[in-house]
Amino acid sequence: MAGVLLATASCVTEPPRNVNNACAIFAEYRDWFTHSNAASRRWNVPLPVLLAIMHQESAFRADAKPSRRWYLGFIPGPRPSSASGYSQALDGTWERYRIATGNRGADRDEFADAVDFMGWYIDQTARQNRIARHDAYNQYLAYHEGQDGFAKGSYRSKTWLMERAHRVRQQAERYRSQLTRCYPQAVTTL
């Protein structure tokens, strides 16, 4: 049994060594550029925005999940949500994506599926909430709070979340600057 667990654990892709540099990420995982660029073009979402939100949500960890609450220091409680994988998509939202796109076999721990989901969600947010696809700050707020929560302004009482959204915007700007050096075609096409 332990051997099966070890074999399964070794199948998870490790996060990039330098998650703060888009060029380093794509040098380490070349297929991630292909998948990210495809999602960017398919959903008309700037690649730096996709990367910055994924950086914040999971730090590019395939097996990311929200932290549990612990009781008495050793009894694990439930997780606060069903968020999982690179995109931290909730079960219901992930299922909506799978149905809407016909990608019924999509997995949240597969980078290609997760980045495509994020493009789809940002596209939906742009349509529903009228947030520009390149507006990393407001797109992140809507990503975190949900499209309905954003519309109701649920983020306004959460200064910590607005600060986090500001960091996402800054990270998107850094990624954009980096990508102009290593993949200029990825930032000039949108």
PLM features per residue range, with description:
Residues 12-190:
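Catalytic glycan-binding domains that act on GlcNAc-containing polysaccharides
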Residues 7-10:
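C-terminal motif of bacterial Sec signal peptides marking the signal peptidase cleavage site
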Residues 1-2:
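Sec-dependent signal peptide recognition
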